[in-house]
């Protein structure tokens, strides 16, 4: 089983950017922790971050047939990117949307997701634990699906 963790714009600044909202851990430390967890579960995990919408779309396209599911923190693209939504849907790869902060408790423009309605699930508001919860959720989903 192989998973892809995609992180969108500004997430490369985690630990420095608004730590009162996004926490003090770096993206690298989150990826290391999740990679260790994946290894313990016998799951492959590839991590990728880009500030560019087109690069994220290309990466999703390149993942077709290579990954079983995607964990995606699309950052601000969650609220604006029809291209990212279309890439996820056309790839036909199950995905979980995740966010560090509770986007529904923030500004109105952050309360709309263009990805959520087609996601397997959405995890939001648990800080860095959102990554672990999303990982566990998609892992359970894939394992249960394979039993059917």
UniProtKB/Swiss-Prot annotation:
Catalytic activity: 3-dehydroquinate = 3-dehydroshikimate + H2O
Positions annotated as active site in the UniProt record: 22, 99
Keywords: Amino-acid biosynthesis, Aromatic amino acid biosynthesis, Lyase
InterPro entries attached to this UniProt entry: DHquinase_II, DHquinase_II_CS, DHquinase_II_sf
PROSITE patterns, A to Z: DEHYDROQUINASE_II (PS01029)
One family name in Pfam for this protein: DHquinase_II
Chain ranges passing through the membrane: none
Any one GO biological process: chorismate biosynthetic process
Gene Ontology molecular function, alphabetical: 3-dehydroquinate dehydratase activity
Pathway(s) this gene product operates in, as recorded in its UniProt entry: Metabolic intermediate biosynthesis; chorismate biosynthesis; chorismate from D-erythrose 4-phosphate and phosphoenolpyruvate: step 3/7
EC number: 4.2.1.10
Cysteine disulfide partners in this protein: none
Assembly and oligomerization: Homododecamer.
PANTHER family membership: CATABOLIC 3-DEHYDROQUINASE
Biological function: Catalyzes a trans-dehydration via an enolate intermediate.
Family per similarity comment: Belongs to the type-II 3-dehydroquinase family.
Protein name: 3-dehydroquinate dehydratase
């Amino acid at each position: 089983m192989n998973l892809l963790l995609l992180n969108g714009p500004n997430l490369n600044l985690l630990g420095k950017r608004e730590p009162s909202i996004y926490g003090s851990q770096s993206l690298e430390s989150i990826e290391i922790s999740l990679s260790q967890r994946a290894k313990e579960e016998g799951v492959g995990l590839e991590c990728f971050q880009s500030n560019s919408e087109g690069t994220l779309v290309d990466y999703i396209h390149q993942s077709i047939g290579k990954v079983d599911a995607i964990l995606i923190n699309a950052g601000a693209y969650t609220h604006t990117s029809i291209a990212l939504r279309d890439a996820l849907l056309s790839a036909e790869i199950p995905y979980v949307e995740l966010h560090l902060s509770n986007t529904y408790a923030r500004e109105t423009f952050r309360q709309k997701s263009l990805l959520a309605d087609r996601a397997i699930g959405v995890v939001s508001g648990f800080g860095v634990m959102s990554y672990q919860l999303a990982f566990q959720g998609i892992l359970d989903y894939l394992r249960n699906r394979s039993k059917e």
